[in-house]
């Protein structure tokens, strides 16, 4: 019995080492930072999520009572509806993930961001606006729950391997589908802000050479068209 347990431990350790080496071949963790810095970064990201979630719902609920300048800007750019769609939140989560110190830190930071954003948005909706859109809330709660796993994977997209390249193209494909609407005979951006989001996403995910970046962009469009054919992808078009 003891021998069996010992062998199992060896097997588990072997698998763990193989997995670590596999992930490190994609992207290595950055230089370590202190625990205090980790805590400060995470708290800052939490408050960023709370601020953006509150601001998003404020624009949505008070759009006819906004201050003059903000109302003018919102009238031109339709910021309220833009913040109610998925593109900007995917971009922010992507940036938080990629620029985190490690894949684990990416998971923690992105999860904390969405907890702050989603909680503040729906608390404002329920207690100030006076209504709670349960169906949309459940979608966002579910997305928040899986965000650590998605962030963990996204962190590796800035690696140097072929798998990192594929991950970057796949992420950009999802971003393409939430920024643009298209079919056999038409192609439109949802708004100028979504165009900016996609451009920033392309810059963030860019490769070492212009040729590689162009190839990534091309592959991402092909993947976007393929993904658009799947019914489950429609969930990412939801609004809050």
Regions found by a protein language model. Give the residues of each.
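Hydrophobic cores of alpha-helical transmembrane segments in multi-pass inner/ER membrane proteins
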Residues: 87-97, 143-155, 195-201
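Central hydrophobic cores of alpha-helical transmembrane segments
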Residues: 108-117, 166-175, 211-225
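Membrane-helix boundary connector in multi-pass membrane proteins
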Residues: 180-191, 198-214
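Juxtamembrane boundary at the C-terminal end of a transmembrane helix
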Residues: 225-240
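N-terminal topogenic module of multi-pass integral membrane proteins
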Residues: 2-118, 122
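Membrane-proximal helix-loop-helix units in multi-pass membrane proteins
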Residues: 119-188
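Hydrophobic core segments of alpha-helical transmembrane domains in multi-pass membrane transport
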Residues: 44-56, 174-178, 198-202, 220-225
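Membrane-water interface at the C-terminal end of transmembrane alpha helices
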Residues: 149-164, 202-216, 224-229
